[in-house]
A protein has these predicted regions:
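Right-handed parallel beta-helix
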Residues: 84, 88-93, 114-125, 147-163, ...
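Short, T/G/N/S-enriched strand-turn elements that build extracellular solenoid repeat scaffolds
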Residues: 48-54, 69-78, 287, 340
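Right-handed parallel beta-helix/beta-spiral solenoid domain characteristic of secreted/periplasmic
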Residues: 42-44, 62-63, 78-132, 161-175, ...
């Protein structure tokens, strides 16, 4: 019995000891840095004092409500799982203010530390722009090698009047000058060091923050990989990008409101060196897989002369299987940008009202990239709005119009008043872009457009759509969108709409429309609204079969995309095919190459190349491979097959392999 009591007492004392380590520190203008900071009466006075303490898991650092604290907060120490270190306020509802004045860098810098949460703070600089100086409100930074940072919550903060350099080169300018910045910093030399261990950042939540009057960006999350969420943030008057997220796997960007972004980037008189990045957008992603942008609102982007962007949304380089859905775009300089080298991205059930200039700009391959826009609504009542197939800056090297674009299904294009649409191919720089709306690709009918509704004028005619519905879709009240997703009920269909049941079924469609109505199997409606009562009962077996077929076709398309467009050489003994992604286990087939010297064909079995990114193909001795030689690739997953050729440039290939 005594033993049990002794053990219980020991456990209790251990618990009390652990709890005692979790301290709450107070900071007040009336405090004293010589105090212990552990009560309001013994509060610290300055940020400088806070920066000298190494904090422990579960600690809290509370600044006095409504008070102003000068300087840059750079705390030390890390929290732990379930015990983050928190920066917040005490003593009232007003936010404490961190004012870091003319200093370069961040108002709050969390560098090479983990498990931190910043809540309910106000961060500002108010200092005027200074050439070469970049600034951030809150920065999470992994600098140097082999730091594995984790768990950052930046929530309910007000960040404003932070003026950094819009471009240039340096650790704090350009994209690194923003209200909230999450980044991994490494120097150029590290990319040439094979022993270098890159740092990582995971578990980032940026939520409920208000951001106003900032240059360059609102929120930048660059390099964080897993569990990245950017949600319910509001921003207005941003010089460059609103939200830019680079690098996550299955990230989530939702319920954000972005007003007047892209306001100063690309201005011809903007001071700075030649390292500007003038092309900016409101909400965009890059180098990311299966990331979702949804329920966001973007209004009134700017577009200065050297900014070729100004889009509300953007799938940028190396976006793979990402989705933009249930978003709203109003009076922006473009709805969506599709860069090249992006694959199987989806834009669905979005509404664009009175966007300007380029509605959608496409820079990638129609066949290889396989991006799709379906069940969106595009409304315009003034100005010319382009589906812009951008072929490049120079006419001499312009992209082939037969391999440029995206797939458009079940969309409504609605032009009224002084508005009209145009399909055009463009070349040239932003400030002197040339459009040709007479070009038409030589593609089978329906290769790009299928089952869309067209109402109102199209300069040079509507696209080639074998199932085009040229009719009034009969919206309830088109053009009446205001502020908020709830203002868009006017884009619901009337019961007599010809769009009801006229669409093409799309598998894996998210199972809901813009307004939350279920989207099931059967005759899908055209547009962002699925009219209840127009669809027969769902057939689960048929729907599952359609989804399975789509996934199977997708795996072959994905394998094809993994192959490059040109075969490179690799020394004297072989040439190589460098894959973008490893080939998955379900893909079978072969790679073959015919020696132009002796006509002999060499073959490699795909099954021997699993989990390999580089395929080395041996060649005959002293062979000159003429321009136009092809490497043939055949792929199958048992249900779907693909055959294609990859050209080899003119190179000298020498070895002894026969």
């Amino acid at each position: 019995m005594n033993k049990i009591i002794t053990m219980s007492l020991a456990a209790m004392l251990a618990t009390l000891s652990i709890s005692a380590q979790e301290k709450t520190y107070f900071v007040s203008p009336d405090g004293n840095d010589g105090s212990d900071g552990l009560s309001v009466e013994s509060a610290w006075k300055t940020i400088h004092k806070v920066n000298t303490v190494v904090f422990q898991p579960g600690d809290k650092i509370l600044f006095e409500s409504g008070a102003v604290f000068k300087g840059q907060l750079k705390p030390l120490g890390s929290g732990s799982e379930g015990k983050p270190i928190t920066i917040s306020s005490f003593g009232g509802e007003k936010r404490p203010v961190i004012d870091f004045g003319e200093a370069e860098g961040a108002g709050i810098l969390l560098e090479n530390i983990s498990y931190w949460e910043v809540k309910g703070m106000e961060i500002t600089s108010k200092a005027p722009f200074k050439i070469g100086v970049g600034r951030q409100g809150i920065s999470v930074t992994a600098s140097g090698a082999d730091h594995n940072l984790k768990h950052f919550v930046i929530k309910d903060n007000y960040i404003h009047d932070i003026w950094g350099q819009m471009g240039g080169r340096g650790e704090n300018v350009g994209y690194y000058s923003s209200a909230i910045l999450v980044r991994i910093l490494r120097n150029r030399e590290s990319f040439r060091d094979p022993s270098y261990k890159p740092s990582t950042i995971n578990e980032v939540r940026i939520e409920g923050n208000k951001i106003e009057r900032v240059d360059k960006c609102g929120i930048v999350c660059w390099g964080a990989r897993d569990n990245v969420v950017v949600r319910k943030n509001y921003m207005d008057n941003i010089g460059g990008d609103g939200i830019f997220v680079n690098g996550p796997y299955r990230g989530l960007i939702e319920y954000n409101v972005i007003r007047r972004s892209c306001m100063r980037a690309g201005a011809p008189d903007l001071p700075g060196d030649d390292g500007w990045w003038p092309h900016v957008a409101a909400c965009w992603i890059q180098d990311t897989e299966e990331t979702i942008m949804q329920f966001n609102e973007v209004y009134d982007t700017g577009r200065n002369i050297y900014n070729g962007d100004g889009f509300a949304y953007d799938f940028d380089f190396n976006c793979k299987r990402c989705i933009a859905q249930y978003n709203y775009s109003k009076e922006n300089n473009g709805f969506l940008l599709l860069m090249y080298n992006i694959f199987e991205n989806v834009a669905r059930y979005n509404i664009s009202e009175n966007d300007k200039t380029h509605l959608v700009q496409m820079q990638g391959s129609l066949k290889d990239d396989n991006n799709i826009l379906y069940n969106n609504v595009f409304y315009v009542d003034h100005g010319l709005l382009d589906l812009d197939f951008f072929r490049g800056n120079e006419k001499e090297t312009a992209k082939d119009i037969n391999d440029l674009g995206a797939h458009f299904h079940n969309n409504i294009f609605y032009a009224t008043g002084q508005g009209q649409f145009r399909t055009a191919y463009s070349t040239g720089e932003t400030w002197k872009r040339e459009f040709d709306d007479t070009l038409r690709p030589d593609l089978p009918s329906g290769s790009m457009f299928m089952s869309n509704c067209y109402f109102g004028p199209w300069k040079s005619g509507i696209p080639d759509d074998p199932k085009a519905l040229v009719a009034d879709p009969k919206f309830i009240a088109p053009g009446t969108g205001g502020d908020g997703l709830c203002s868009l009920a006017g884009y619901r269909l009337r019961p007599d709409s010809p769009c009801i049941g006229a669409g093409t079924y799309i598998p894996d469609n998210g199972r809901r429309d813009f307004f939350g109505q279920p989207v099931t199997d059967g005759k899908t409606d055209i547009g962002a609204f699925e009219y209840l009562g127009s669809i027969p009962e769902s057939d689960p077996e048929k729907e599952a079969a359609l989804d399975k077929a789509a996934r199977e076709a997708s795996s072959v398309a994905w394998a094809r995309w993994s192959f490059p467009k040109v075969v490179a050489t690799n020394g004297p003994s072989r040439f190589t095919i460098r894959l973008r992604e490893p080939i998955t286990d379900d893909i079978k087939g072969q790679i073959s190459w015919t020696n132009p010297d002796n006509g002999k064909t060499y073959k490699l079995d795909i099954s021997k190349l699993k989990d390999r990114r580089t395929i080395a193909i041996p060649v005959n001795a002293n062979v000159s491979v003429p321009d136009g030689t092809k490497v043939k690739v055949s792929l199958t997953n048992g249900s779907f097959s693909e055959e294609f050729e990859i050209p080899v440039k003119e190179v000298e290939l020498r070895n002894r392999w026969q």
